[in-house]
Amino acid sequence: MKAHPKEMVPLMGKRVAAPSGNPAILPEKRPAEITPTKKSAHFFLEIEGFEPNPTVAKTSPPVFSKPMDSNIRQCISGNCDDMDSPQSPQDDVTETPSNPNSPSAQLAKEEQRRKKRRLKKRIFAAVSEGCVEELVELLVELQELCRRRHDEDVPDFLMHKLTASDTGKTCLMKALLNINPNTKEIVRILLAFAEENDILGRFINAEYTEEAYEGQTALNIAIERRQGDIAALLIAAGADVNAHAKGAFFNPKYQHEGFYFGETPLALAACTNQPEIVQLLMEHEQTDITSRDSRGNNILHALVTVAEDFKTQNDFVKRMYDMILLRSGNWELETTRNNDGLTPLQLAAKMGKAEILKYILSREIKEKRLRSLSRKFTDWAYGPVSSSLYDLTNVDTTTDNSVLEITVYNTNIDNRHEMLTLEPLHTLLHMKWKKFAKHMFFLSFCFYFFYNITLTLVSYYRPREEEAIPHPLALTHKMGWLQLLGRMFVLIWAMCISVKEGIAIFLLRPSDLQSILSDAWFHFVFFIQAVLVILSVFLYLFAYKEYLACLVLAMALGWANMLYYTRGFQSMGMYSVMIQKVILHDVLKFLFVYIVFLLGFGVALASLIEKCPKDNKDCSSYGSFSDAVLELFKLTIGLGDLNIQQNSKYPILFLFLLITYVILTFVLLLNMLIALMGETVENVSKESERIWRLQRARTILEFEKMLPEWLRSRFRMGELCKVAEDDFRLCLRINEVKWTEWKTHVSFLNEDPGPVRRTDFNKIQDSSRNNSKTTLNAFEEVEEFPETSV
């Protein structure tokens, strides 16, 4: 299986492996015997065990038969010698007549020339159909053609004959795409031929040139076809173990039309669950485990990408992730950022891979020498109680693209409510709320409540309509200093709100409409309310009576915005969510259907009414389109009547249309709306706690962004811990009680249980690291492969 190509025998005049595995002997020829008259037809009759009519081995169609190995291609240029994946030619042998000048002799020569031109097609057909004897014959024929050329042209000529010009696919790739019982033997013969003619390096590392599969090599195909023996043979023969397949088929943008695996052979083996090949590649001295693809992803990024939501897939991904990380022993492999600035941990959060995210966050390695690869450390344990330290690297908001921010703000993932229940995210948010967020939330509520009270009082005691609008600074007994201060406070606070919410809206991605409708709606309503207040003030300054319309709308919207502060309480936080979801999911759809009915029936009824005389007081209320629409709307809410006016052209038809409209809208649509709203409320109630936690998490992060940098550093969570030699991490301590799990074989950072003096993160200096905790008392049993605990 691991035979080196130098151990393989050349094809001509030496031993060649027969299909059955027993080598056949080619007798060495004298120079005079090299070119017999019927060489092309009867050369292999001299080979022991050769059969004139070999049985073609039938193969099963390959997995990628259409995208990578199409057997039908139209020859447009007429140069069918360069066609990819040629059809099987007829190999009938034409006997050469005795008279070389006869017409039959000329036809025979022409047939021989056509066979030479079809040599590439015949080689590709032989390797795809598993015809070993025919392949050997064709390679000998190809080698004879090479003797007529200059030595410097031979390598290029051979590569041209062994490679499809339109796709860059070699006959070696063709053989691997059509697996059959003779594939391994065919690969050996091709490698031996390439080595004998000094083209092994070019031949084995040839890449696809077609855009869809650009960069794919024979090693990639062997791994994808799960041919471990052939993959080992190619690696031993010098295949490039760091080749990158960059075609569109392997691009994650087209994941529904292709397969993304990270481009490299190692990543392909890992993503397709082939641990033997992964081990073989990692043991190879030329394999670059830290290699990154064109998107900046390394092998761990690729594993996160292929993970799915079902258990079987996640189990093998976690095993591969574990195996690669532990065998490499390189902590930086997990901290590498791709072109989007995401580590494998952050990528798992962005893609909503909850199981993989949980595994990475809580990975605890029990072996002492590899403890630095953990993200969870057991500080001490006593019975069922243990104190765990969770690494906050790339988790807290102190870093860009933190897991916490990605999870809270990414509306493209449906399970972010579930992801926020994972540790340490759950405890981290709870500690932030207790430390500063709840106090800021209460102050914000007080200020906004006082703002609404002041706005209401100022609006209520405004000059009435019968009075002239006074100058704003004309302080009389009716308008004193208190009212002026109230108006100034309302104006200043409204300007502050408009600036704050305007910046927040500007920072939102316009393309993320779902985020705006689901999470960021309060930014818009607060901004609109503040703008209405400012607009009413300026209209009042210039003595426009229209200021009252803006003022009334601002008051109504201001008190409605108080629902935002219900998210501070779990029992009341559902009201705003229910109202939001009912409006966006149910009411908008109802209004669309209702407006269609309203306009249609309004036009119909208005068309049935004749023009009324001006002196007729009993004129129909359906005399115009606008009047008809208004009357139909009254019928919808139960305020209209079904009286028939005398001036309708067809009273029976008029009545029929009214009754139909009432049935469709008042009876059918309204009851459907009520049913849909009830279903929405029920669904929200089932996820009430998770939705409320997501609301509160977004509120916490919004308030944290408002803090200045010096204050944010004071409120930073975690403690600096020494987890290994010269390895200090900012960790979050979580005490856990597990009656089903006893920490008997886990290495502890401290022998003695109980609380210890925590290091204040804000007071740590570089010199204080020598005074950090003394660690590394272990009780584990050293094993060949360290276990992990999730």
From Swiss-Prot:
What results from changing N561A? Impairs channel activation by tetrahydrocannabivarin
A single Gene Ontology CC term:
lysosome
Keywords (alphabetical) are: ANK repeat, Calcium, Calcium channel, Calcium transport, Cell membrane, Cytoplasm, Disease variant, Ion channel, Ion transport, Lysosome, Membrane, Metal-binding, Palmoplantar keratoderma, Repeat, Sodium, Transmembrane, Transmembrane helix, Transport
Annotated residues that bind Na(+) are located at G638
Q: InterPro entries per the record?
A: Ankyrin_rpt (IPR002110), Ankyrin_rpt-contain_sf (IPR036770), Ion_trans_dom (IPR005821), TRPV (IPR024862), TrpV1-4 (IPR008347)
Polar residues bias: where?
95-105
Q: What is its main location?
A: membrane
Regulation of activity: what does the record state?
Activated by cannabinoid that binds to the vanilloid binding pocket. Diphenylboronic anhydride induces pore dilation and enhances cation permeability by promoting the conversion to a homopentamer.
Q: What's the impact of mutating L557A?
A: Impairs channel activation by tetrahydrocannabivarin
Question: What Gene Ontology terms describe what this protein does at the molecular function level?
Answer: calcium channel activity; identical protein binding; metal ion binding; sodium channel activity
Q: Which GO terms describe its biological process?
A: actin filament organization; calcium ion import across plasma membrane; calcium ion transmembrane transport; negative regulation of hair cycle; osmosensory signaling pathway; positive regulation of calcium ion import; response to temperature stimulus
Q: Which residues lie on this side of the membrane: Extracellular?
A: 461-479, 541-545, 609-620, 647-649
Cytoplasmic compartment spans: 1-430, 509-519, 567-569, 687-790
This protein's membrane topology, according to the annotation, is: Multi-pass membrane protein
Q: In which tissues is it expressed?
A: Abundantly expressed in CNS. Widely expressed at low levels. Detected in dorsal root ganglion (at protein level). Expressed in the keratinocyte layers of the outer root sheath and, to lesser extent, to the matrix of the hair follicles (at protein level).
The family classification in the record reads:
Belongs to the transient receptor (TC 1.A.4) family. TrpV subfamily. TRPV3 sub-subfamily.
The subunit structure is: Homotetramer. May convert from a homotetramer to a homopentamer to allow pore dilation. Interacts with TRPV1; may form a heteromeric channel with TRPV1. Interacts with SNX11; this interaction promotes TRPV3 trafficking from the cell membrane to lysosome for degradation.
Which disease appears in this protein's record?
Olmsted syndrome 1: An autosomal dominant, rare congenital disorder characterized by bilateral mutilating palmoplantar keratoderma and periorificial keratotic plaques with severe itching at all lesions. Diffuse alopecia, constriction of digits, and onychodystrophy have also been reported. Infections and squamous cell carcinomas can arise on the keratotic areas. The digital constriction may progress to autoamputation of fingers and toes. Palmoplantar keratoderma, non-epidermolytic, focal 2: A dermatological disorder characterized by non-epidermolytic, abnormal thickening of the skin on the palms and soles. Focal palmoplantar keratoderma consists of localized areas of hyperkeratosis located mainly on pressure points and sites of recurrent friction.
Q: Specify the protein name.
A: Transient receptor potential cation channel subfamily V member 3
What is the source species?
Answer: Homo sapiens (Human)
